[in-house]
Amino acid sequence: MSSQRRVTGLRKKLAMVLAIAFILLMWQIAAWSLPDFLMPGVPTVLARLWGDIQTPAFRVALWGSLTRLGGGYGAALLLGIGFGLIGAVLFFFREVLKSAIVILQSIPSIAWVPLFLILMGFGNLPIIVVVAIAAFFPAALSVMNATESVQQVHVSAARVMGASRWSLLRRVYLPAVMPELITGAQLAFGNAWRALISAEMLVGFGKGLGRTLSYAGETADMVGVMTNILAIAILAALIDQVILENLKHRLLRYQYV
């Protein structure tokens, strides 16, 4: 199994490298086909990115975005996992929550921004709340859907042995839903990241990668636009493929041995 795991890991890395190469190739072909002021080439943007990441302004924007992401994404995971597990032992609560999520998740995350700006004013809090809303739905749904597939024989056996609802959640449901929970966390991150960048662009307040991208667009700085898009994509890939994937393998190590 360990050799199979290594082969699978190598295939995933190769697929990622090929995907990046394909994207860069298509980008460069587009740059050759259009004037420089409309589509700068890959080398130009990479050189600009290398220069930008060494500036204090970039570090301030990066820290601002990561701070908002951490607050919103962390809150969403805690609430989503908590409510999802509660739904495992409270059937009516689960059905009400799932119905509410079906209704609310159809609303684009960016549509919440004006509401929370009016309620909370300018600052980090409305962006954090929007990020939390965007990430909450996949986190909660993944846990609730996973709890429905838990074998009832295990639940019944635990109840026969006198397990309380808390014990059921901690010793039966949580271990059983862990794989789906991690997958839900990755889906939630994608939602959170998109909501963060969109909200920062719309709010136009404070420092962040979304605000930096918006400013580049306002000043018709196409190199700056592509540089910020590239920075946003690279950072998202690093968080998802390095941090979250490694965490996934550590938490689910028993499945790979």
PLM regions and their residue ranges:
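Hydrophobic alpha-helical elements at and bordering transmembrane segments
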Residues: 58-62, 66, 96-103, 143, ...
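Transmembrane alpha-helical segments of polytopic membrane transport and secretion proteins
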Residues: 1-21, 241-257
